[in-house]
């Protein structure tokens, strides 16, 4: 093992040590890997979304110019990228929609996987030279760290989604039949995640009293599912706070159509 490789391995080790039980930062891992290997780096999710992008400031980028954090591949190209199940060297990144026309160059593609399946792909590329064995070791270490962090992020997101669903279900369970009907009609008319509604018009249309709508909104607001505010003659401002609300309400819509 070369002295430089050992030094870089210790950098990764120190990052893990410093993080302790807290999640590591995707950006820090990707940037360190890019600096250590003089590479452009792209971290892509399973669905083809760029989670992190690093461009080596010292050389012309091998990544297509449109690649920035949040950019997403189309399904066909994401499937091509997902077809690399083992570490690949010098793949044609243009086929995957990743590489630039001028500098497809030298590259490494590393699949980020757990026993539950693929989580994403780590891509390193540069135009001036091929990757040495020491650099491949560093890329594999970065991939290992990123796989761990992606798995943790996905797990935490699943926990948040389950909690949000439970909160919405609990809020719905407090509604009477007429209040549930009112809520469903309200959110059928709400355009997007927030907007203004006139409760009296909805009450007349549905055939319920305005107080039923007020009570239903109050229960949802108490549960932290929505924010509502009366604006007098203009109507009532409503904003959805819980992202699970619409999906849960959709399960009840058929009975009120």
Q: Where do the language-model regions lie?
A:
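Structured interaction and signal-relay segments at domain junctions
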Residues: 2-10, 19-103
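Signal-transducing coiled-coil/dimerization helices and immediately adjacent hinge/linker segments
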Residues: 152-241
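Short, amphipathic alpha-helical interaction segments positioned at domain boundaries
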Residues: 243-257
